Amino acid sequence: QSGVIFANKDIDTANKLKDLLITNYYRISTSTDINGVEVCAAIKNIFAMAIGAATGLNKTKIKDNTYLNTSAALFRQSIYEMEIFVDFLNGKKETVKSLAGLGDLYVSAAGGRNSKMGALIGDGIVFSKATKNNMPNVTVEGAELIFEIGQKVKKDFDEKKLPLMIAMINAIIYDKKLEIKWENF
């Protein structure tokens, strides 16, 4: 099974496309929130890196799935900050709780380039070294987006409002170890 979301300012057009392409294994939802869907598609990559960092950020000495609680905390914060960011860019907060937000973030955080880079950063490896030694010639969309929007985000938002996103921005742009201010969650 697979699910996607089609966004169009005209819901009838989106629904016609849905009717043409839907199958018993390819499920399609529709939305008129073009801004929200597009913003979620982009910023979920930043948050997938953050969630991927959980294995290294977990500070217990127990070796098993204890990082899952850290992942859950990061996932929840990611959704919260995605809502703030989508709203800021004139999207609808509820879009974050659709396939465009929650669904896409889950898939990206479960595996892939952003999650892999996040795991390296969570282990204390700075971005430039992680890129050079572990992921050369690999495009990490979340990092690319941070280089594009990071400074503007830091200018427009207080660190207490988007603590996770700003922690990722600081780690990538300034090439330093990831420092999350958990007290701001």
Model-predicted regions and their roles:
Residues 68-103, 110-111, 123-137:
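Small-residue-rich helix-loop
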Residues 15-19, 47-54, 76-83, 87, ...:
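Predominant activation on well-ordered alpha-helical scaffold segments within soluble catalytic domains
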Residues 44, 56, 60, 105-108, ...:
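Short, electropositive, low-hydrophobicity segments enriched in small/polar residues
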Residues 111-185:
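C-terminal active-site/capping subdomain that shapes the small-molecule cofactor and substrate pocket
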Residues 1-95:
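Internal alpha-helical scaffold of NAD(P)-dependent oxidoreductase catalytic cores
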Residues 37-38, 107, 138:
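Short, small-residue-enriched loops and turns at beta-alpha junctions
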